[in-house]
Amino acid sequence: MSSRCLSLLLCATACFGAGGRVLRVCADPNNMPFSNRAQQGFENQLANLIAKDLGMTVQYYWFPQRSSFFRKTLNAGHCDIVMGLPSGMDDAATSVPYYRSSYVFVSRRDRRLNIKSMDDPRLHHLRIGVHTIGDGDGSLPPVNALISRGIVHNLVGFNIYGRLDEKNPPADLIRAVENNKVDIAIAWGPMAGYFAKHSSVPLQVTPVDVVSPDPKIPFTFAISMGVRRGDSQLLQRLNSEIQQHRPRIHRLLESYGVPLLAAPPSAAAIAIPERSQLLRNCCKRGTDL
């Protein structure tokens, strides 16, 4: 074990062990409805619930969720837990899932589009808003699925990261629907559901019903909490907390407008190829969700 690894281990023991009562959480300071510096996100609320149950207090390490998020936060020893990441992703040891959600269509109710499928022929002609990411990170599931169907020229891209000084950059996509800049958007459900719920314009949010010819394009994700690999004690505590408070957690998520899906019939059903990179981007994770 290197001196650096040893120092990180000692730090984690001091902060979480018997002598410390602080639960260190890494989070994005500007990523509603997940988290923000004012601690208004549902991941903030969930962290408080768990910390209170364990007789601890939450201490945040704030860092914008970009592609380097896990390397510069959790795996650099700045915290013990990240609240929302895809189950089984490579960057951390993940808990049992505490919710499952999907991408959704978002449109104005007065348009009465009622689109549910990526194979709806109207998608070839409507202005479709989608989130985009920087070069070198690949594309998000909606973009890949649309391109595979020959739907390209009517796509309107909105950078999911935005500017650091911009409030809630991913919400620009939903605002474009409100303002008729696009006819319909395809977005990650928890983000879209929250901003649609708080919109001054009545919006319709519909989970994407995809029968994709390419199984490598997932549209649903199981979401877990993450700890550093090897931290089995904390992981076991989180699993216990999730199981104990699952109904309460789901009520919290529903209050934020998060579209919830039933759990898959088996763990294998959520073992989706490449999901860690996809969700990392879709939820500013990374999600990333």
Give the location of each predicted region.
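A conserved helix-loop-strand patch within extracytoplasmic ligand-binding domains
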Residues: 56, 87-90, 97-150
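Periplasmic-binding protein-like
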Residues: 28-31, 100-104, 111-114, 157-160, ...
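Bacterial N-terminal signal peptides that target proteins for export
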Residues: 1-6
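Extracytoplasmic small-molecule ligand-binding "clamshell" domains
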Residues: 19-91, 163-167, 256
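Extended ligand-binding regions for polar small-molecule ligands
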Residues: 41-53, 109-113, 119-137, 213-260
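A ligand-binding cleft/hinge motif common to bilobed small-molecule-binding domains
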Residues: 68-69, 75, 83-93, 178-217
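Hydrophobic residues within well-ordered alpha-helices
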Residues: 50, 73-75, 121, 176-178, ...
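Hydrophobic h-region of N-terminal signal peptides that target proteins for export
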Residues: 11-17
